[in-house]
Amino acid sequence: MTNIHNDKILILDFGAQYTQLIARRIRELGVYCEIWAWDHNPAEIAGFGAKGIILSGGPESTTLPGAPAAPQEVFDSGLPIFGICYGMQTLAAQLGGATEAADQREFGHAEVNVINPDALFKGLSDHGGEPKLNVWMSHGDHVSVAPPGFTITATTDRIPVAAMANEEKRWYGVQFHPEVTHTLQGQALLRRFVVDVCGCQTLWTAANIIDDQITRVREQVGDDEVILGLSGGVDSSVVAALLHKAIGEKLTCVFVDTGLLRWQEGDQVMAMFAEHMGVKVVRVNAADRYFAALEGVSDPEAKRKIIGNLFVEIFDEESNKLKNAKWLAQGTIYPDVIESAGSKTGKAHVIKSHHNVGGLPEHMKLGLVEPLRELFKDEVRRLGVELGLPRTMVYRHPFPGPGLGVRILGEVKREYAELLAKADAIFIDELRKADLYDKTSQAFAVFLPVKSVGVVGDARAYEWVIALRAVETIDFMTAHWAHLPYEFLGTVSNRIINELRGVSRVVYDISGKPPATIEWE
């Protein structure tokens, strides 16, 4: 079988907000890549076996002493190098060029003039054949003098070196960000570096990743049994489908129905995995235990801890019944791995174990199976579709680990959870009907534990308030509230109030992030 990890790119991260985006763009081209810190062990960088190295952007300044720099091994490797933003600046500074601080930062759209087309720029244009490109800039410093052996390949009205190249050594630098969509030819530039210059084959596809992981899992677990906590979320669902394909009956999924899930989610999970796919699923109806444990608790952090600890307790009880289970499968994905890494600089991204179940008892002594640990979320979704999971499940909006427990403000009660689950289902149903679901990044209902006066028939009634929240975001770090049509919101409000006894008022949350968070608790 072809090794889909053979042709790979190494990204050295200098702390840029866009570094993961570079990696995702390269993966989209069909090429495997990893993100390591700029100060990673140089011997490991040299021994990684990359076909090319990308130096990312970053917040530092090469004009200051002690600025982060690429290890000498990068230049000694003989590999193609592509410096982006700060990556180009450190390339210039380390190889005998010069950088300087600009009078003012350049942030936003810019027009680049290609003056000496190289392997990356040849034939590219956003202006009907003219050698001009529309790009996205985000920098304070810039390269003022290209290093010896480099040709200036592009300029702008504001900076003398917008791009440079040493074609003989296959070293390239650009001051702008090809990884963001605002740079219209960005993906074409990355393709030219990764595929044309570095010679990478495009083997990183959903079908190949599935085949590769099936082989790896079978080699790892042999004839042992594997246990998986199935939540109904995207990651654990894809792990369940993938492992079922790899080891069949040797997989047991434990689905803990907390009573805090989406409307009828427990039945949907059982229908999809147990009935439709034939996966062995143990369903634990634990709602009574959860509501008892949460009684009288209103602090959000305390609620999260109780919900998390109780899950671990129940999962432990169920795993003890499976005497032959030697492995625990988890839906750890690559951003989890990156975030869990640390170094002397705080910027290292070394692959190491990350427990997304959190706090599993030491005595479980199970080996870890993490078939998604190399993948970004968008890749996990593509795998899900390839594995035959319904698109509506794979592309669902995020749902918090503690479930409705953090969407009910204050104390959690069974009656609140049932009302909220139904209200949320109405909101989502109407979003789908109006073709608005995929246009929002996350949408949900929140239960407010305050009673508001309403009129039911001829009588006054004091009933609960439901808040609706919908946001649009690229990375969930910042978000705008979704400008849903008034008529649509009116339809949702009418349905919730008419169909749910106990709700007299529906409000819409128009707060951005920041200052508000996406979830209310």
Curated annotation (Swiss-Prot):
Query: What residues does the GMPS ATP-PPase domain cover?
Result: 204-396
Which UniProt keyword terms apply here? ATP-binding, Glutamine amidotransferase, GMP biosynthesis, Ligase, Nucleotide-binding, Purine biosynthesis
| Gene Ontology CC annotation, any one | cytosol
Source domain of life: Bacteria
Fetch the Gene3D superfamilies from UniProt. Answer: 3.30.300.10, 3.40.50.880, HUPs
Q: Which NCBIfam families match?
A: guaA_Cterm, guaA_Nterm, PRK00074.1
> Which gene produces this protein?
guaA
Glutamine amidotransferase type-1 domain location is 8-203
Query: Which reactions is this enzyme annotated as catalysing?
Result: XMP + L-glutamine + ATP + H2O = GMP + L-glutamate + AMP + diphosphate + 2 H(+)
Name of the protein in question: GMP synthase [glutamine-hydrolyzing]
- The active site annotation covers C85 (nucleophile), H177, E179
InterPro entries named in the record: Class_I_gatase-like, GATASE, GMP_synth_C, GMP_synth_GATase, GMP_synthase, GMPS_ATP_PPase_dom, NAD/GMP_synthase, Rossmann-like_a/b/a_fold
SUPFAM superfamilies per record:
Adenine nucleotide alpha hydrolases-like (SSF52402), Class I glutamine amidotransferase-like (SSF52317), GMP synthetase C-terminal dimerisation domain (SSF54810)
